[in-house]
Amino acid sequence: MAVICNTCGLPEDLCACGELAKDSTKIIIRLETRRFKKKGTMIEGLDPKLNNLETVAKELKSKYACGGTAKEGYIFLQGDHRDTIKDTLTDLGFAEESIELH
């Protein structure tokens, strides 16, 4: 017997609740200066309940060959990656309209 989603009532293989919630989140990308004037890219607005932040951070760190961390609701990457991060997040399945660059 198929498992039924509690939110939409559809079988789990047809459920699109996670994708709809992923499209409705507002992601903010900005440059942040940390200790010793080191710059880093801050990605905020990711819901840790819907997205596995460690997995997304691992994908981004391997793509940009940089260090970084995933904490409560944000991902911090070492270095300035604002010019290409929007395309990368779109490739990972986030809606382009929900990504805001500061």
Swiss-Prot record:
Highest taxon of source: Archaea
PROSITE patterns: SUI1 (PS50296)
Protein name, as recorded: Protein translation factor SUI1 homolog
UniProt keyword list: Protein biosynthesis, Translation regulation
GO terms, molecular function: translation initiation factor activity
Record keyword Ribosomal protein present: no
GO terms under biological process: formation of translation preinitiation complex; regulation of translation; translation reinitiation
InterPro entries listed in its UniProt record: DENR/SUI1_TIF, SUI1, SUI1_arc, SUI1_arc_bac, SUI1_dom_sf
Similarity comment text for this entry: Belongs to the SUI1 family.
Pfam families with a match to the protein in the record: SUI1
Keyword Protein biosynthesis: yes
NCBIfam families tied to this protein: PRK00939.1
